Amino acid sequence: MDLNAFREETRDWLESNCPESMRIGAVHFEDAYELYQTDEAIEWRDRAAAKGWTAPAWPTQYGGGGLGKDEHRVLAEEMARIKAIPPATGMGLAMIGPTILELGTDEQRARHIPKIVSGEAQWCQGYSEPGAGSDLAGLQTKAVLDGDQFIINGQKIWTSGAQYANWMFALV
């Protein structure tokens, strides 16, 4: 697609679909969790997800936008122009999603990536432990294979965003 045409299409779509309340520029980390739970933020996320723009460069087969680097840059520029906050954020998009895309099985990609893109799956990270803090070399939690599943024993603490998450990726 011609980048100028894509820019115009993107600009028009953002003007029509990004709520004014989501055009606030940057959001402080501590405020982001609550903001992204509001009805308007969920509406913004759902509209963007339907277009694949919660994960613009991820493959379309999993709900991503399939954008190349130039289109992705244009989208980012147009969002910045209107001070739109990202339609979705979190550990799913930032950490575990890219890991699953790169290293996961086809089954794992099909199971998890569309739910990350849509916002149905909210992830948190389980790293810190009592007595170890975030010293990853001191982790005590263990995962033991039992048949076809892992049994995890241990404790995790200080899990940012856990109150909003329905999935956790944990270091063991």
Regions found by a protein language model. Name each.
Residues 42-119, 160-167:
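Internal helix-loop-helix
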Residues 148-149, 153-172:
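A short core secondary-structure module
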Residues 132-135, 150:
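Hydrophobic, small-residue-rich alpha-helical packing segments that form membrane-like cores
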Residues 141-144:
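A structural signal for short hydrophobic beta-strand segments in well-ordered beta-sheet cores
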Residues 21-47:
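Short secondary-structure junction/hinge motifs that connect adjacent elements
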Residues 1-5:
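Intrinsic disorder at enzyme termini
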Residues 119-127:
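A short, Trp-centered hydrophobic/proline-enriched beta-strand micro-motif
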Residues 27-36, 60-64, 96-102, 128-131:
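Conserved short loop/turn motifs at secondary-structure junctions
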